[in-house]
Amino acid sequence: MRKSAIAVVMAAGLIAGVAPAEAATAPTRPTAAQKLQLQYLVEEEKLARDVYAYLAANVTSQKFSNITKSEQTHMDNISALLKKYNFFNPTLTRAPGVFRDAELQKLYNDLIAQGSVNLAAAMQVGVAIEELDIADLKKIMVTPAPADVKLAYDLLLKGSYNHLAAFSR
């Protein structure tokens, strides 16, 4: 009986996309550090969305409009995790281009100025944002996380690579 229970647990972990060793060590709730990371990530996704929305309105490229929608989806996914775990969402009452994190606020202002020069500069801003997202995600993905948080990280990373490719063409 005990062996079959272990087999069921291992199978459930494999179905969920988690290796048996990971299933045993993955936390069921985000740590305090992961809470802060999720709050930062939702603001970082907001930065991307807000910059791309501004550039879509001021630079002639459909890429910015399309990727703005994708960034909103990323924000929605992280926002859902924040809500699920009853964590504060720093983006809920913020207007476009307004951030709680002072470094992100400065970065937004700088990127808008850089991207407003011409289409080539705007595309470089897109590359810079996606490279930043990828670097930040890779840093935080080394720590075990709950399955839903890990899945969100994986989807954000995949999306960032897709956006990077679009801006690099």
Task: Name each region found by the language model.
Residues 25-169:
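All-alpha RGS (Regulator of G-protein Signaling) helical domain and cognate RGS-like helical scaffolds
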Residues 1-7:
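Bacterial N-terminal signal peptides that target proteins for export
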Residues 18-25:
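Sec/Tat signal peptide C-region and signal peptidase I cleavage site
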Residues 8-16:
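Bacterial N-terminal signal peptides
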